[in-house]
Every structure is written in C-alpha cells, then in structure tokens.
UniProtKB/Swiss-Prot annotation:
Subcellular location: Secreted
Protein name (Swiss-Prot/TrEMBL): Phospholipase A2 inhibitor LNF2
Source organism (scientific name): Lachesis muta muta (Bushmaster)
Job of this protein: Inhibits the enzymatic activity of phospholipase A2 (PA2).
Keywords: Disulfide bond, Glycoprotein, Phospholipase A2 inhibitor, Secreted, Signal
Family: Belongs to the CNF-like-inhibitor family.
Keyword Hydrolase part of the UniProt annotation: no
C-alpha cells in the first residue's frame, strides 16, 4: 500500500509546489475556503488531502488543500487501525486545475480479527503516548510507528505519535520526510511484522 506518506499528511500537511497556483487552506469538515498561492518546485499539481478519525459511529473529517508533487498524488489512500475500534484514514486527490473533485471515504470494511496485534496509540503534543493493544483485522499484518513534529505559530509546536495495524509496509525513509519551510520534521518511521496473539 505505498501510502505511509499519506499517514504523515495527518499531521504535516505536505510541502508547497512549482510555477502554478493552487488554493491553500485547512478546515474541519468536507471543504475549506482559503487563498491562492504560487507553488514552488518540485510541486507541480493542486490537490486535496482528506483525513478522518473514525471511532464506532463517530467520525471527524478534515480537508487540506495545497500544492503537491505528482509522486505524493500517486499515494492514494491509507487506513490505520489504532485499536479500540478506531481508524485513522487518509485520501489524496490531485488535479491539473482547480477545482479538484472529492475522493469519498467508503465505509470501513467488515473483517474479523486475524490473530495478530500491534501497539496502538494516537498522541498529540507528545511522542511517548500510552500504548494499548490494537487487534488487527483482515489483511492487517504489519505494525507502523510514526513520530514527528510540526512547528506552528498557533497553537504552538505540535508533536505527534501514531501507532497501529496496516496491511503492508510502504517504502519510506527519514530522508523522504516532507517539509514545509522547515516547519515539519519526521523523527521516526518504523514498520514491522504484527505480533501473533497468544493461544488460550
């Protein structure tokens, strides 16, 4: 699922782009109104990132419009099972010109526990979140762990930590960390095999 970059977009909102101009905004909900800004290399297309935190029947969605590189646009989607029946999901949608069409979230797949688990955590303002057992479902046989920082004037510097089950490990190293004028820093990216649950 070459999509680990997409998870990072939950917190780092990607870098700016090339000689074209794109809308730039962030908001809670399905859309946002912002301002147009010129992109700088190597970003060459306009895009939207849709992010969702789902827990049982409750979900919170955000939208982020920005300039993107075409490589990020190919990442598509990611679903991270962080445990306690909760998921972090991301969708990337790019276009040659505004407005970009929305890429909707399908319903979460109904799948059974598969006998594996991963450390689960979702932490903001900390890189050492309390871990709990995230029971993996369906094809989720890998564990991810991401720690990073985003530097903001308001509400201040944000440290984040994300752990959970995913279906596969994409190729990503710290050297690929996305930056936005040095405001984003990816400190840790780990992806390992999930742990088999002990038999009763």
């Amino acid at each position: 699922m070459k999509s680990l970059h997409t998870i990072c977009l939950l917190f780092i909102f990607v870098a700016r782009g090339n000689s074209r101009s794109c809308d730039f905004c962030h908001n809670i909900g399905k859309d946002c109104d912002g301002y147009e800004q010129e992109c700088s290399s190597p970003e060459d297309v306009c895009g939207k990132v849709f992010l969702e935190i789902s827990s049982a029947s409750l979900s919170v969605r955000t939208v982020h419009k920005n300039c993107f590189s075409s490589s990020i646009c190919k990442l598509g989607q990611i679903d991270v099972n962080i445990g306690h029946h909760s998921y972090i999901r991301g969708r990337v949608n790019c276009c040659e010109k505004e407005p970009c069409e929305d890429q909707p979230f399908p319903g979460l797949p109904l799948s059974r526990p598969n006998g594996y688990y991963c450390p689960g955590a979702l932490g903001l303002f900390t890189e050492d979140s309390t871990e709990y057992e995230a029971i993996c479902h369906g094809t989720e046989t890998k564990c991810i762990n991401i720690v990073g920082h985003r530097y903001e004037n308001f509400p201040g510097d944000i440290t984040y930590n994300l752990k959970g089950c995913v279906s596969s490990c994409p190729l990503l190293s710290l050297s690929n960390a996305t930056r936005e004028e040095n405001r984003n820093y990816l400190q840790k990216v780990e992806c390992k095999d999930a742990i088999r649950l002990a038999s009763l």
